[in-house]
């Protein structure tokens, strides 16, 4: 993981989805591209959080294709390594999970549906 907030190209749909009642905030790319077998996600744990977060990439059937490690507040991860190649247009789910820092109890999860948007030119 890297410190701070990333500088993300506009075409990757980087945003901060938030649902009422969530105990943490995060940012992630809605338009996921592939770079050498890795998904470009820019998962960012907001600086004001206390929760640790991680991201799983799932296929349409819920099978896990890859996941990040735990990311601390004010850190981000650009890539998630994938277990298989995903062609452009493949439907995927990004599952973001939060954990309380001392107990590792769940701090809630959010799932975003998206598709692979092609090869990264980053």
Predicted feature locations:
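Asparagine-centered strand-capping/turn motif at beta-strand->loop junctions
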Residues: 42-47
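Beta-sandwich strand segments
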Residues: 102-110
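Beta-strand signatures of extracellular beta-sandwich domains
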Residues: 54-58
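Solvent-exposed serine/threonine-rich low-complexity stretches and specific carbohydrate-binding patches
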Residues: 63-75
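Short, aromatic- and glycine-rich surface loops/edge beta-strands on solvent-exposed regions
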Residues: 88-100
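Structural beta-strand segments of beta-rich domains
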Residues: 37-41
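Transition segment at domain starts
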Residues: 1-34, 115-121
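Exposed aromatic-hydrophobic patches
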Residues: 76-84
